[in-house]
Amino acid sequence: MEILNIQNHKRNYLPLLLLADEQEDMINRYLDRGELFALMDPELKTVCVVTQEENRVFEIKNLATVPEAQNQGYGKRMVEFICRHYRGRCDRLLVGTGDSPLTIPFYEKCGFQISHRVPNFFLDHYDHPIFEGGKRLIDMVYLEMALSD
């Protein structure tokens, strides 16, 4: 297993990124300015995009695992890698996600704690209703993890 930092042709990963953020114009807002990582084992399993939002504050914008490899620990391994990679140059690592029974417990198990929410984010920024785990997403829930030494 290896994790690669993808510098070029980031849009080649769009089909997988769309699993985690199903509106392409939203992905376009962060893909070019973010770092894209790909977990290979030996083929592509998981991708993650991380952006710098403030001085020493980074955010996981997208984390997606190919459907056949889900629930096998690849997402957790990617989050662990991201924490190691940004430790020392990042005080806080954020992740924004829908108020979903699938994603919030995942990030909490990875060590994130709920920080705040942005009301009506999915209503205001997406051109169609977004559902996850049978639940319509309305608010964006932010979780954070302290990474300062």
Regions found by a protein language model. Give the residues of each.
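Short secondary-structure capping/turn micro-motifs that flank functional sites
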Residues: 33, 101-102, 122-124
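Conserved acetyl-CoA pyrophosphate-binding loop and the N-cap/start of the following alpha-helix
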Residues: 69, 73-81
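Conserved GNAT acetyl-CoA-binding A-motif
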Residues: 85-99
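Short hydrophobic/aromatic beta-strand or adjacent loop that forms the aromatic wall/cage
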Residues: 34-36, 137-143
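Conserved N-terminal entry element of GNAT/NAT acetyltransferase domains
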Residues: 1-9, 141, 145-149
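Acetyl-CoA-dependent GNAT
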Residues: 4-67, 79
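Conserved catalytic-core motifs of GNAT/GCN5-like acyltransferases
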Residues: 94-96, 108, 113-134
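Conserved short alpha-helix immediately C-terminal to the canonical SAM/SAH-binding motif I
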Residues: 78, 102-103
